[in-house]
Curated annotation (Swiss-Prot):
Broad class of where this protein is predominantly found: cytoplasm
Residue span, PTS EIIA type-2 domain: 6-150
Localization terms from the record: Cytoplasm
Organism: Pseudomonas aeruginosa (strain ATCC 15692 / DSM 22644 / CIP 104116 / JCM 14847 / LMG 12228 / 1C / PRS 101 / PAO1)
Keyword set, alphabetical order: Cytoplasm, Kinase, Transferase
Swiss-Prot/TrEMBL GO biological process terms: phosphoenolpyruvate-dependent sugar phosphotransferase system
GO CC annotations, alphabetized: cytoplasm
PANTHER family named among the record's database cross-references: NITROGEN REGULATORY PROTEIN, PTS SYSTEM FRUCTOSE-LIKE EIIA COMPONENT-RELATED
The UniProt record lists the keyword Kinase: yes
Domain notes from UniProt: The PTS EIIA type-2 domain may serve a regulatory function, through its phosphorylation activity.
Name of the protein this chain belongs to: Nitrogen regulatory protein
Superkingdom in the source lineage: Bacteria
SUPFAM superfamilies recorded: Phoshotransferase/anion transport protein (SSF55804)
Keyword presence, Cytoplasm: yes
Length: 154
């Protein structure tokens, strides 16, 4: 079973990210992934994330969003985690603005693996103590380490 810590890197874990709007956050996600993985085009990632949002918001409540999409040319899942400097409206189910985002990009053919990763993220973020730890992470490295620690039962 693939685990979140296997597809997330410290370089794709960011704190104090300027938000502004849902669209701007999705652009920043696309640019972040394309910067670290230049084989992917930021505009394509952005368009796929926007298309997925049009199907229904990935804002799940409690200030959390899990933007995700399938991506042509993607061979294995890619994740990122961002803590925004200020919450943004993400059309979340509970109406609350979002400040914590877990991103999941998967191959076009991904099915069960994609769903398993979404389950892992949702289960982790369902815990108030984990959300508090993530929100209080002072650095990108600390944010990444919290995800790893939680995945390892700490």
């Amino acid at each position: 079973m693939i685990r979140l810590e296997q597809i997330l890197t410290p370089g794709r874990s960011l704190v104090n990210v300027p938000g502004g709007s849902k669209k701007r956050v999705l652009e920043q996600i696309a640019n972040l992934v394309a910067r670290e993985l230049p084989e992917f085009d930021a505009q394509t990632i952005f368009e796929n994330l926007v298309a997925r949002e049009k199907l229904g918001s990935t804002g799940f409540g409690n200030g959390i969003a899990i933007p995700h999409c399938r991506l042509s040319g993607c061979q294995s899942p890619i994740s990122a985690v961002l803590h925004l400097d200020a919450p943004v409206d993400f059309d979340a189910l509970d109406g609350a603005p979002v400040d914590l985002l877990f991103v999941l990009l998967v191959p076009e053919a991904a099915t069960e693996e994609h769903l398993e990763l979404l389950r892992q993220i949702a289960a982790m973020l369902d815990r108030a103590d984990v959300r508090d730890r993530l929100r209080s992470a002072p650095t990108a490295e600390a944010l990444y380490q919290i995800v790893v620690d939680v995945q390892n039962g700490q």
